[in-house]
From Swiss-Prot:
Belongs to the class-I aminoacyl-tRNA synthetase family. It catalyses: tRNA(Leu) + L-leucine + ATP = L-leucyl-tRNA(Leu) + AMP + diphosphate. GO terms for molecular function: aminoacyl-tRNA deacylase activity; ATP binding; leucine-tRNA ligase activity. GO terms for biological process: leucyl-tRNA aminoacylation. The keyword Metal-binding does not apply. PROSITE patterns: AA_TRNA_LIGASE_I. The keyword Nucleotide-binding applies. This is Leucine--tRNA ligase. It comes from Phocaeicola vulgatus (strain ATCC 8482 / DSM 1447 / JCM 5826 / CCUG 4940 / NBRC 14291 / NCTC 11154) (Bacteroides vulgatus). Disulfide bonds: none annotated.
Length: 944
């Protein structure tokens, strides 16, 4: 009986679906284990072989935990909102919902063929109203909350309104956009609109003026990671910096908790460090500077308070509100020209680019420690969102300030004894302070730092600043609030209407607010987002429903928000929704949340380190504050799978001809390498006829072969349609089967490493499965396994495998597991193993890797339940102990022969036995050995 993978895989996929094999419910009698993949965006291209890598890795682990007796949740869904479907709608007129559903159906078909243990009963799609109901609900909760710094948690905004009415904001310690000061009397005298504007300063979801990446052609704001080299990642359209009123989430309020939480999760050190750097905590000092000949003052933040005496100029971010205030008439044209240039660069590009650019504002600031007037410059190396958007420049001790000072010929004053700043800045925080103040200058203040260490000088300056009302000590974070608006159609609508220009939430009992139909998916002619085309997009407060726009009276019927939510909105709490996806009353029930708690294993790419993995942690912490999520951290263990790169093939066309020369002959001609479809190449040998049929221009191609074959060149590149190196998993499944695909993807290398796809090795994995099959079936279709006692050798082989595979799965070293399977099968084949107990354990071990194959043989062994419900075998160390040990017998360090000894033989027995052996006597030749050296369990060396 041959291994017929097509019949087997079809049979078991159907059986799993009919029996709901992977459907799971809360079971208090079992320990839970929650496995989750970062769910895919369903693109039109479908899956290539790189996409399932992480899914296969997590599926192996999920199956393994189920075999260990855990109740395993392993769901799948779709991150269904996104730009590609909307762009396709703009080009074709086809509604994004249709495109998305078609793409999802294609993805589902491909995923099913690979044999994943997903509980499809829990599938979520972020574009469905039943799902985004809870995205809208969470947004409303954020709008109706503020962040209390004293208790370090979100609290109801109603607490603030009550406190303001009684005490004003005296003593309030809350996260805010700007620091305000007002009394209860002043608050109570304000209009409703004025009060709402003040509350907006504290809400966790708020409207704020922010600098954004604006793409005119796409008509929307883009996140930093959607912009590359000043153009949009999608379409390559120009992107500029623009100030807009946008919905924002006060992620910055959670900065310290986001940092602290990293100490409680099992993530890689590199990913944790990436997040720590992104959050960017720094302890420092805020200092007030006065503008010369003006009443204007501004604040800077510095972590190097010891360097105040070395400030030789100030720098403002181009977006700073101080720029128009401090720009003199004489400098106005030059400044405006500079601002136009900087608008074309994203913050990320500005951080990465070390080129020096800037312009003088025309104004000067007074250094409060020296009394000197220092010039105020404008430069894009200063960012508006970090600190105060203004810096004091100390070129002697900061590399970017140093480069700026050198470029514009500004003074450089060293502040550390013995430091040389003739070629570069001295950035080390070590040494003895000098020139603070300079000896040749009359002191302006009564502070002297000379002779102190840098650490002592920082502390002394902080005390001086506080004592003389020059500023305050402060902790800053680089982490910004998240911009939460997009000027697109295909996204979650905001459950918001506008009254007197201020936002109000629709009643939560009326959620979800569904996305309306529009005639066009582009912005309106007046520049409004695509929802501006909707004719039925107004909110009737009394009826609690959406009505026609022409009914708007701004009394009971109001306009609805025209922006939609960004891509990360739907993915920020999907792990919670999987716990209870059909609950119409809550995001997740208390029972489900308390049972599943959080994700035990999360698998996805490192590209989400500073996006999704920050936002989802913030979102979960907020829901934890509300008592919705029992765990503060959503993902306990995170594994980042590497990328499967493409292995491109090349043909070599002789210049000015349609003749192609084989790889090893190409140096004899002047050739041009051309990418060729890898699907018509096998083991680097081109299917010449398929190539001629591939493209019309190659129909009459001629070939110069070697040994009757056309050998292609190859290179490892990104898997891309333009390089013709995309491999469709459907083709691999059709040719070799899903179990071969699963095992081969794991065999390519460690899960976390990137590696090239190379079909040249897939035959070996397929042959392994055939060889294993032969342990169960003879060539005459006889079923071979029988009952009986296993031999010592069989027990040793299988328990060695149990130990190896168990350890490898725990560490995601799947590639070495598969090597171990191959070794074990070779050993069992040599032993002519027919033992049912041994072979049953072998199949259980294989089940996570090759589930269809394992199910078929498990059933053949007489089992009536799924192999998924078998018990993972425990290894017995006793079976791995060696009864005998092979010693190498050496004479004067040269190995001559080997001898076997009992594992517990003592040195005296070993020496006596060796010396009496005929082979030893031959090499001793009657001499008396000087000494005998025995290395336990390895070598006996006789020194003559």
């Amino acid at each position: 009986m041959e291994y017929n993978f097509r019949e087997i895989e079809k049979k078991w996929q159907q059986r799993w679906a009919e029996n709901h094999t992977y459907q799971v419910t809360e079971d208090e009698s079992k320990k839970k284990f929650y496995v989750l993949n970062m769910f895919p965006y369903p693109s039109g291209a479908g899956l290539h072989v790189g996409h399932p890598l992480g899914y296969i890795a997590s599926d192996i682990y999920a199956r393994y935990k189920r075999l260990q007796g855990f109740n395993v949740l392993n769901p799948m869904g779709y991150d269904a909102y996104g730009l590609p479907a909307e762009q396709y709608a703009i080009q074709t007129g086809q509604h994004p919902a249709i495109t998305t559903v078609n793409n999802i159906n294609r993805y589902r078909e491909q995923l099913d063929k690979i044999g994943f243990s997903f509980d499809w009963n829990r599938e979520v799609r972020t574009c469905e109203p039943g799902y985004y109901h809870w995205t809208q609900w969470a947004f409303q909760q954020m709008f109706n909350s503020y962040y209390c710094n004293d208790t370090q948690q979100a609290r109801p905004i109603s607490e603030l309104t009550e406190a303001f009415a009684r005490y004003g904001n005296e003593g309030l310690n809350a996260a805010c956009s700007e620091e305000l000061s007002f009394t209860a009397e002043e608050w109570n005298a304000k209009s409703e609109k004025e009060q709402q504007e003040i509350l907006m300063n504290y809400r966790i979801a708020y409207l704020g003026e922010t600098m954004v990446n604006w793409c005119p052609q796409l008509g929307t704001v883009l996140a930093n990671d959607e912009v590359v080299d000043g153009v949009s990642e999608r379409g390559g359209f120009p992107v500029v910096q623009k100030k807009m009123r946008q919905w924002c989430l006060r992620v910055s309020a959670y900065a310290q908790r986001l940092l602290d939480g990293l100490d409680t999760v099992d993530w890689t050190d590199s990913l944790k460090e990436t997040q720590r750097n992104w959050i960017g905590r720094s302890e420092g000092t805020e200092v007030q500077f006065k503008v010369k000949d003006s009443d204007i003052e501004f604040t800077i933040f510095t972590t190097r308070a010891d360097t105040m005496f070395g400030v030789t100029f100030m720098v403002l971010a181009p977006e700073s509100e101080l720029v128009p205030q401090l720009t003199t008439e004489a400098q106005k044209a030059e400044v405006e020209a500079y601002l136009d240039r900087t608008k074309k660069r994203t913050e990320r590009e500005r951080i990465a680019d070390r080129r020096v650019t800037g312009v003088f504002s025309g104004s000067y600031a007074i250094n409060p420690f020296t009394g000197e007037a220092v010039p105020v410059w404008i430069s894009d190396y200063v960012l508006a969102g970090y600190g105060t958007g203004a810096i004091m420049a100390v070129p002697a001790h900061d590399s970017r300030d140093y480069a700026f000072a050198k470029h514009f010929n500004l003074p450089i004053v060293p502040l550390v004894e013995g430091c040389d700043v003739s070629e570069e800045s001295f950035d080390a925080k070590e040494g003895i302070v000098c020139n603070s103040p300079r000896k040749d200058v009359t002191p302006y203040c009564d502070l002297s730092l000379n002779g102190l260490t840098i650490k002592e000088a920082i502390a002394a300056t902080k005390e001086y600043v506080k004592a003389h009302n020059l500023g305050r000590v402060k902790v800053n974070y680089r982490l910004r609030d998240a911009i939460f608006s997009r000027q697109r159609y295909w996204g979650e609508p905001f459950p918001v209407y506008y009254k007197n220009g201020m936002p109000y939430m629709i009643d939560s009992s009326k959620l979800p607010l569904e996305l309306p139909e529009v005639a066009k998916f582009l912005p309106t002619e007046t520049g409004e987002p695509p929802l501006g085309h909707a004719t039925k997009w107004a909110w009737d407060v009394e009826k609690g429903e959406v009505v026609e726009n022409n009914l708007i009276d701004n009394v009971t019927i109001f306009p609805l928000e025209l922006n939609t939510m960004p891509g990360f909105a739907g993915s920020s709490a999907y792990y919670l929704r999987y716990m209870d996806p059909h609950n119409a009353q809550a995001l997740v029930s208390e029972k489900a949340d308390h049972y599943w708690q959080n994700v035990d294993l999360y698998v996805g790419g490192t590209e989400h380190a500073t996006g999704h993995l920050i936002y989802s942690r913030f979102w979960n912490k907020f829901l934890h504050d509300l008592g919705v999520s029992i765990k503060e951290e959503p993902f306990q263990k995170l594994v980042n799978q590497g990328m499967i790169q493409g292995r491109s093939n090349f043909v070599y066309r002789i210049k000015d001809t349609n003749t192609f020369v084989s790889l090893n002959l190409k140096d004899q001609y002047e050739t041009t390498p051309l990418h060729v479809d890898v699907n018509i190449v096998s083991n680097d040998i081109l299917d010449v006829e398929a190539f001629k049929a591939w493209r019309p221009e190659y129909n009459d191609a001629e070939f110069i072969l070697e040994d009757g074959k056309y050998i292609c060149g190859w290179a490892v590149e990104k898997m891309s349609k333009s390089m013709y190196n995309v491999v469709n998993p459907d083709m691999i499944v059709e040719k070799y089967g899903a179990d071969t695909l699963r095992m081969y993807e794991m065999f390519l290398g460690p899960v976390e490493q990137s590696k090239p796809w190379d079909t040249n090795g897939i035959d070996g994995v397929h042959r392994f499965l055939k060889k294993l099959w032969n342990l169960f079936y003879s060539r005459t279709d006889e079923f071979l396994p029988v009952e009986g006692e296993p031999t010592k050798e069989e027990l040793k082989a299988i328990h060695k495998l149990i130990k190896k595979v168990t350890g490898d799965i725990e560490t995601f070293s799947y590639n070495t597991s598969i090597s171990a399977f191959m070794i074990c099968v070779n050993e069992l084949t040599s032993l002519k193993c027919r033992n049912k107990e041994v072979l049953s354990n072998l199949i259980i071990l294989l089940a996570p890797f090759a589930p269809h194959y394992a199910e078929e043989l498990w059933e053949a062994l007489g089992n009536t339940t799924s192999v998924c419900d078998a018990q993972w075998p425990a290894f017995n160390e006793d079976y791995l102990k060696e009864d005998t040990v092979k010693y190498t017998i050496s004479f004067n360090g040269k190995a001559r022969f080997t001898m076997d000894f009992a594992a517990d033989a003592d040195n005296n027995t070993i020496q006596t036995t060796v010396m009496a052996d005929e082979q030893a006597q031959k090499w001793i030749e009657g001499k008396t050995p000087k000494k005998v050296i025995i290395v336990p369990k390895k070598i006996v060396n006789i020194v003559l």
